[in-house]
Amino acid sequence: MCHIILLGMNHKTAPVEMRERLAVACRQEVNPLRLLPRLENVDELLFLSTCNRVEFLFTCRDRDGGLREVTALLRTYLGLDSTEGVENHVYAFRGMEAVRHVFRVASSLDSMVVGEPQILGQLKSAYREATEWRTVKVILNRLLHKTFSVAKRVRSETCIGSNAVSISYAAVELAKKIFGSLQDKRVLLIGAGEMAELAAEHLLAQGVRHMVVANRTLERAVDLAKRFRAETTPFDHILNALKNTDIVLSSTGAPEPILKYNDVRARMRERRNKPLFFIDIAVPRDIDPKINEIDNVYLYDIDDLQGVIDLNREERKREAERAEHIIAGETLKFQEWMATLNVVPTIVALREKAETIRRSELQRTLSHLPHMSEKDRLAVEALTEAIVKKLLHDPIVFLKKKADRSTKDMYVDYTQQLFNLADGDDGEEAPAVTVQMASAGNDGTLLKTFEPDKESPWRKS
């Protein structure tokens, strides 16, 4: 039996320390796909790695053996030794749960910021690498193509990516509206907490190439900068950094403003009054409101963003529900396709036998018609192909319709006996494909995950 399994960790399950390992591993460009030939139980493999997520999507015959091998692969990728556990930070989905999860990831329903577009491009890159390494075959090829079409449906039929639902996202969207493209803008992030992290995620998604992080604790600034390909500057050098900055986004926990009117005014002279935009999303505020009075300085605070956020949150929730409905329907369609794989060996055998008979009879007939022109020979061959195709159409459609029913085996057996398909083979039927339906709540949250057996790598000693 063939199982579809997804094993991974993301921003919801892994602490900052583990996610930092993800960022380091991602930059090393070490591709685990090259190790597939060493995995005895894994048939197909796709590998997705971002700053906030690492996932292995694979098919295998032996579920526990496959999980054990891919867990070891995850350890290797993260550079963990045998004493460092990952079990508490890893999730695993199988069957249609895995399919549904991939659909949700591609549709950005499982992202740190619901609706962000970056993850789909990352998943496409992962699939492109897998095809180059030839680690995907029939099942994962079909699944990934379906995944991309599902994500496209979600984008086109919902407004999931249209409305900002976090202060950080709204701040970046505001900057985008002000400047248009952010690719050539220099951004100074003050603070390295969760809001700064989210802002960095959005800025990166918008193509920002010049980002500087400042934080009272330099180590935190360095950690954030590593994960988002940014630079750092000491906290007491913030004023100096203003000289070459277009956008300042501040989100510290300081009890009083860290940027004062007189300080900013002095730096504006050095900038020759080049426009400078401040987005203050801290509470209490990081930036003296009075700086808005300085020429060519534009200040926006959290109150300017919050009203938009409140309106958009309900709209995004409704759009997410619509997206989940699309995903549920597409998951069922994929389940139906998977079920047809159970009858594929019989269908293939039926077509091959019909083709063998067609060619044999055609050759025998044409041998008695030596004076027939090449054009007429081709016409007769096309005729026989069309007849065979039409004769097989109804029984093949019938088998596919019965593929996901409990009586499937009976109909497969009848077909094999009726057309004498077992004649001359070894009597063994091709491996079946195990399909399991996902359990999910109305809000799209996971209700069940992989339950380990006694020999599973997840069980603690």
Curated annotation (Swiss-Prot):
Write down the CDD domains for this protein, in alphabetical order.
Answer: NAD_bind_Glutamyl_tRNA_reduct
Per the Swiss-Prot or TrEMBL record, the active site comprises: C51
Alphabetically, the GO molecular function entries are: glutamyl-tRNA reductase activity; NADP binding
Pathway entry: Porphyrin-containing compound metabolism; protoporphyrin-IX biosynthesis; 5-aminolevulinate from L-glutamyl-tRNA(Glu): step 1/2
Q: Keywords, A to Z?
A: NADP, Oxidoreductase, Porphyrin biosynthesis
Site (Important for activity): which residue positions? H101
Q: Name one Pfam family in it.
A: Shikimate_DH
Q: Which reaction does it catalyse?
A: (S)-4-amino-5-oxopentanoate + tRNA(Glu) + NADP(+) = L-glutamyl-tRNA(Glu) + NADPH + H(+)
In this chain, NADP(+) is annotated as bound at G191, A192, G193, E194, M195, A196
Q: Could you provide one GO biological process annotation from this protein's UniProt record?
A: protoporphyrinogen IX biosynthetic process from glutamate
Q: What is its EC number?
A: 1.2.1.70
Highest rank taxon of the organism: Bacteria
Keyword Coiled coil among UniProt keywords: no
Which residues are listed for substrate binding in this entry? T50, C51, N52, R53, S111, E116, P117, Q118, Q122
Task: Write out the domain note.
Answer: Possesses an unusual extended V-shaped dimeric structure with each monomer consisting of three distinct domains arranged along a curved 'spinal' alpha-helix. The N-terminal catalytic domain specifically recognizes the glutamate moiety of the substrate. The second domain is the NADPH-binding domain, and the third C-terminal domain is responsible for dimerization.
Additional note from the record: During catalysis, the active site Cys acts as a nucleophile attacking the alpha-carbonyl group of tRNA-bound glutamate with the formation of a thioester intermediate between enzyme and glutamate, and the concomitant release of tRNA(Glu). The thioester intermediate is finally reduced by direct hydride transfer from NADPH, to form the product GSA.
State how it assembles. Homodimer.
* Family listed: Belongs to the glutamyl-tRNA reductase family.
**What is the recorded function of this protein according to its Swiss-Prot or TrEMBL entry?**
Catalyzes the NADPH-dependent reduction of glutamyl-tRNA(Glu) to glutamate 1-semialdehyde (GSA).
Question: What's this protein's name?
Answer: Glutamyl-tRNA reductase
* Species of the source: Syntrophobacter fumaroxidans (strain DSM 10017 / MPOB)
